[in-house]
């Protein structure tokens, strides 16, 4: 059987998930306005889709430049479930692909999480109306399930970055000096000026 490479660029494309009809793949990608390969700056992971027949990739704007990972199609192919930390905690959200309506599926004190920042932590069971997700609580990771039946409350999307300032947790500071963390915080350190 033939292997076909669908994305052929510098972007980090992760966590592919097939649509029920097999025509589209949703995935997570660092495509976005904040990605600049010359300055080595990268957008937070966003949702994206690729049309398998044409190779056309499009990003799906949801909450701005925050984490959007682990996309999973609903049974009808008209909704996409994903994990985002748009308010400082990673929770599961549902995006209607028809009208762009966004609903919160979970609202957990500790958030939905895998073992690492980008680890998949949620799965939609085809034909069952159930999702499973992992939560770190009581000093352990646990798997929970939730029924997806019924209406979910729509959430307000904050468009203006200044209005989001109070919605995120403050950044953590390293306990001790880290040269690597210092370099990573300033992507232009050690690079030649752009006009050379």
Report residues per predicted region.
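Hydrophobic beta-strand positions that form the internal "hydrophobic ladder"
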Residues: 25, 80, 131-132
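Outer-membrane beta-barrel initiation region
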Residues: 142, 147-196
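A flexible loop/linker signature enriched in serine peptidases of the S9 family
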Residues: 1, 5-14, 28-48, 52, ...
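Residue-level detector of Asp-centered blade-edge/turn motifs that repeat once per structural unit
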Residues: 20-21, 75-76, 126-127
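Signature of short aromatic-glycine-proline-rich micro-motifs recurring in repeat-based ectodomains
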Residues: 116-129
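Conserved beta-strand position repeated across blades of beta-propeller domains
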Residues: 17, 72-74, 123
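Segments that shape or occlude catalytic/ligand-binding pockets
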Residues: 102
């Amino acid at each position: 059987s033939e292997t076909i490479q669908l994305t052929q660029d510098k972007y980090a494309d992760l966590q592919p998930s097939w649509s029920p009809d097999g025509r589209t793949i949703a995935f997570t990608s660092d495509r976005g306005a904040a990605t600049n390969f010359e300055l080595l700056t990268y957008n937070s992971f966003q949702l994206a889709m690729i049309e398998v027949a044409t190779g056309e990739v499009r990003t799906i704007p949801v909450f701005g430049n925050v984490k959007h990972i682990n996309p999973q199609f609903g049974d009808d192919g008209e909704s996409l479930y994903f994990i985002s930390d748009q308010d400082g905690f990673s929770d599961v959200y549902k995006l209607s692909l028809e009208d762009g309506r966004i609903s919160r599926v979970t609202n957990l004190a500790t958030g939905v999480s895998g073992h690492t920042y980008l680890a998949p932590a949620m799965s939609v069971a085809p034909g069952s109306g159930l999702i499973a997700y992992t939560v770190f609580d009581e000093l352990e990771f646990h798997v929970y399930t939730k029924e997806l039946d019924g209406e979910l409350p729509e959430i307000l999307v904050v468009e203006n970055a200044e209005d989001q300032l109070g919605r995120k947790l403050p950044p953590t500071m390293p306990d001790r000096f880290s040269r690597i963390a210092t370099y990573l915080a300033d992507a232009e350190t050690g690079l030649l000026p752009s006009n050379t």
